[in-house]
């Protein structure tokens, strides 16, 4: 199989700029001036103390004393921020290289992302795009994050990868219908470790397990894709829970 063609910095910036127009969860800054800001941290995040501290902040915001609930939501939020811009850019034919990715978090705002050295590859079709995205997001980012989680909390692998799948599919709820994005998401959901975590159907994605958000006091809602909800009946809109 031939190696994917490299994409120039200008192509990567253009694809990420287009992705960012879908909303804040799709934004990755490529501004070189951000290099002067010492609050950026490299990704993947492997510091258990840092992640444990963020989990505690999430727990405080959610009003829960259950560390694993907050850790689950933290993982899903980070997965969403990683999938959303990369999949949107890949649907335009360019997959960014995330080896220079940095992150910054402030309460009440989406995780901010900055790519220090914009580079990447051109994707010639859905299968090639899925190969590249899987390598960048799953292998390069989510697997190291998943490996760090057990150092400060207890969450099953199936739950974490269900969260990752939910975050991936949830990106399709933002912006206009896009056949290329949908095909790419469907292809990624068919590959390990996401394969078997849920089903992408005409009403959207339904996962086979639960992110634990329903345990947030005083009685958190079930998410719209939760495996604990019944499927919608014919002609009925999809259930609405936490986005």
Region spans (language model):
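Generic hydrophobic, helix-prone segments enriched in Leu/Val/Ile
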Residues: 4-5, 9-20, 90, 142, ...
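Hydrophobic, aromatic-lined core segments that form the binding pocket/scaffold
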Residues: 39-202
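Generic N-terminal leader/targeting and pre-domain segments
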Residues: 1-67
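Cys/His-clustered metal-coordination modules, chiefly Zn-binding fingers
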Residues: 173-243
